[in-house]
């Protein structure tokens, strides 16, 4: 196996192991630690840390440590989060969440930079077009990485499946589930017995082991790389703090970006709702915590499959059709969740919603990044720093108000953000279509550069 492909596979399986652990834990935070809103407070803090670090930390760390050791250091932050869950309290989870937030932006920036460098190295070696090889390597990475949502949630459901079978849930309790839930943000998940501490420790032990394996795999087998510099140029230095910070906000002078910041915020809002509210107020409330993993498997599988499908489909349809599909799908889900009264007798419905949600999320993850890559090609670093910043802000706001609002209100907020984001996107699409080079949608997909393909934590 040639060296560059080996490095891509090492990176991919390292992320698979890491996010098998983190993804499963994130899905359970709001259900396991619902007392006083600790779970959602931890997630809000996490994304707050990411929001701040995304403005300046990634280029500084990558410049000082290189991509490989930035990846290893950032992964250690995720392992610390798993360890913090062993003794979950405000004094352990909140600092651990800050660490993950600080490491997340650096992790994804280093991942994108590394894949771009090895893709271009392979292209020079074989005489291929650079962007084609980079696109191929990103495709391999996400094909492997996206399955982490399946494995992490499968592990949690199998472990918690050892819990004693609970009795019939009282009808009056079911009436408080779903959009009607206004109490479970501050009360324990009362629809199911909390898993025994032994089961929780077993799950955390498995997740922590996956994290340590990821760090070990990257530290031992991933080869360090450096971006090739044109002849006569000095080695590229990490930009100073103020330069990075200012370039991020200076790009907001562009009217198109000011309109498009609603798209990454929507991505943050909708992911936060599914992992923080749907898992707790619909699944845990009506079925039990042991079903959280299974419903999130549907989300992860649908997201992964549709990401691959939409990436190919966009070449033929353009982005506009896919944005419309994502908006209509998410709109239908929001309206249905407002009206639906979850009940254990409707078991298949619990899996349909996250599957459709995953399809819509696949649109936002693939097409938002492609859109930013095309519109702001000359300022891609600042553009994607803005993307990470505004998506993180969406997470922070959504998790921040999670303990204070009824689920129905959160759904109306999400509906408003979706409507505003689509209106803003339509305005940009219309403006671009009037330019001499034709409609933006005709641009098809363009392989993203330097971390421009994924912003998920």
From Swiss-Prot:
Region named Disordered: 438-457
Presence of keyword Transmembrane helix: yes
Residues spanning the membrane: 8-28, 42-62, 65-85, 86-106, 140-160, 202-222, 257-277, 291-311, 320-340, 344-364, 395-415
Compartments, record wording: Cell membrane
Membrane topology: Multi-pass membrane protein
Record: glycosylation sites: 190
Keyword set includes Transmembrane: yes
InterPro entries reported for this sequence: Ion_channel_UNC-93 (IPR010291), MFS_trans_sf (IPR036259), UNC-93_regulatory (IPR051951)
Origin: domain of life: Eukaryota
Gene3D superfamilies, sorted: MFS general substrate transporter like domains (1.20.1250.20)
GO CC aspect terms: plasma membrane
Record PANTHER family: PROTEIN UNC-93 HOMOLOG A, UNC-93 RELATED
Family from the record: Belongs to the unc-93 family.
Protein name as it appears in the record: Protein unc-93 homolog A
């Amino acid at each position: 196996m040639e060296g560059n492909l080996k490095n891509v596979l090492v990176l991919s399986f390292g992320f698979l192991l890491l996010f098998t652990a983190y993804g499963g834990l994130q899905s359970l935070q709001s259900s396991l630690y619902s007392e006083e809103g600790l779970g959602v407070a931890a997630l809000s803090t996490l994304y707050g840390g990411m929001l701040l670090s995304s403005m300046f930390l990634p280029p500084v760390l990558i410049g000082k440590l290189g991509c490989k050791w930035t990846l290893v250091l950032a992964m250690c932050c995720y392992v610390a989060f798993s360890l913090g869950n062993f003794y979950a309290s405000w004094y352990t989870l909140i600092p651990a969440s800050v660490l993950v937030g600080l490491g997340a932006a650096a992790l994804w920036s280093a991942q994108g930079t590394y894949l771009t460098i090895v893709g271009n190295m392979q292209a020079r070696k074989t005489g291929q077009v650079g962007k084609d090889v980079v696109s191929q390597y990103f495709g391999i990475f996400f094909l492997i990485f996206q399955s982490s949502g399946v494995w992490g949630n499968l592990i949690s459901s199998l472990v918690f499946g050892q819990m004693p079978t609970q009795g019939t849930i009282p009808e009056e309790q079911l009436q408080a589930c779903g959009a009607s839930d206004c109490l479970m943000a501050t009360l324990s998940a009362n629809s199911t017995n909390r898993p025994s501490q032994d089961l929780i420790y077993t799950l955390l032990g498995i997740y922590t082991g996956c994290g340590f394996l990821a760090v070990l795999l990257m530290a031992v087998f991933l080869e360090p790389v450096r971006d090739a510099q044109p002849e006569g140029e000095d080695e590229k230095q990490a930009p100073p703090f103020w330069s990075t910070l200012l370039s991020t906000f200076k790009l907001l002078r562009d009217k198109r970006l000011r309109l498009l910041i609603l798209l990454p915020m929507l991505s943050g809002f909708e992911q936060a709702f599914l992992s923080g509210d749907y898992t707790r107020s619909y699944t845990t409330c009506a079925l039990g915590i042991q079903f959280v993993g299974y419903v999130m498997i549907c989300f992860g599988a649908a997201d992964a499959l549709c990401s691959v499908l939409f990436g190919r489909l966009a070449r033929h349809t353009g982005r506009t059709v896919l944005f419309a599909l994502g908006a209509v799908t998410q709109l239908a889900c929001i309206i249905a969740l407002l009206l639906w009264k979850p009940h254990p007798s409707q078991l298949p419905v619990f899996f349909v919603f996250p599957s459709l949600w995953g399809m819509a999320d696949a649109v936002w993850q693939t097409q938002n990044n492609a859109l930013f890559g095309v519109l702001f090609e000359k300022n891609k670093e600042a553009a994607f720093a803005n993307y990470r910043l505004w998506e993180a802000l969406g997470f922070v706001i959504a998790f921040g108000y999670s303990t204070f609002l009824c689920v129905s209100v959160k759904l109306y907020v999400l509906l408003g953000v979706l409507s505003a984001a689509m209106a803003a996107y339509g305005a940009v699409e219309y403006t671009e279509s009037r330019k001499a080079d034709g409609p933006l949608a005709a641009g098809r997909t363009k392989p993203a550069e330097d971390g421009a393909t994924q912003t998920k934590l």
